[in-house]
Swiss-Prot record:
Pathway: Opine metabolism; octopine degradation. Heterodimer of a subunit A and a subunit B. Signal peptide: none annotated. This is Opine oxidase subunit B. Keywords: Oxidoreductase, Plasmid. The keyword Oxidoreductase applies. GO terms for molecular function: oxidoreductase activity. The keyword Secreted does not apply. It is an enzyme of class 1 (oxidoreductase). It comes from the Bacteria. GO terms for cellular component: cytoplasm.
Amino acid sequence: MYEVDMTIIGGGLVGASIAWGLARSGTKPLVLDGADLDLRASRANFALVWVQGKGLHAPHYALWSDASARRWPTMANTLLDDSGIDVGLQQDGAFTFALSEEELEANRQDMESIELETNGRAPQFEVLDRQQTLDRVLGIGPEVVGSIYCAADGHVNALRLFHALHAAMERQGATYRPNHPVQSIEPTTGGFILKGEAFSILSRRIVLAAGLDNKRLAPMVGLSCPLKRSKGQILVTEKTQTALPCLSAGMRQADEGGIMIGDSEETDNTRISSSPDISAVLASRALRIFPALSDLNVVRSWTGFRVKTADGVPIYDHSERYPGAFLVACHSGVTLAANHALIVAQQIAAGQLEDELSVFSARRFHAQQAV
């Protein structure tokens, strides 16, 4: 039987970020990944480094997101050194546009609640009326009544980030095995036996970073990972030399020139196919915000399933019953990548998650049920 010290189950953005961080700290993990056609959030993400509006009624999540966004410049530079790939990080701030006074007021209340709940430690924001928004953003449509602006937000090139993480983790000594889905985990003396269709591996320590499959795998090591279905859809326009004037919650322009339009959510759909109705809604809202987009053709559309926990807040756990088993689950794999690579990986390498992460344990769901 093949024996290793550390295995990460899952090679998406979360698993690769942790694998790279572990490899840099001296722990050279084996990464077992699924197939290309598996339901992967990593290949359908919007690539935002985003803190605006995150952590409503969960101040620890708001501050955790902000901390990761602040670490992203270090992450991007280190990743460039290790992989030779520039992930195109831009952190110039972003807008959330409102198409009604009610929408603007709801967004303002959410941001003020986060500010209050974090005792003013969350990133600063501005509530802008229509004229103030026009002064900063050219070309907005007549229906835009105002916006929220946060200077902490940004984005990266999604495909280059994924490529860079995989290149960097392997150059630092991680071993990557695609098409190796784990069917079962058996705790045993000296670690865990991981079994797949054509392999059996004894690993002293493991990290569950398998996205949607964490829900199935977690109970095998005495953990839980409550997830809810969340399907998102993205439209991509043809490449254009005309720059989108700003980054926003539902629109971003990749550095190659194409404009991505997203921000949908379906909770009762299991099909991977795109919905024409949702495409129409996404396109309509985008055109109401930036009418000039009508000159562009949509050339691609795809969907993905977010790894969204039952309350939307990440889960970081360490099995009490089977020490050596860790779990990480979140739907903010890009934003939190810096924390995962630079902070969480080091704690896993040391064998214990620190107290600051205890509030993210899935035990919170059991406590809620008890109440």
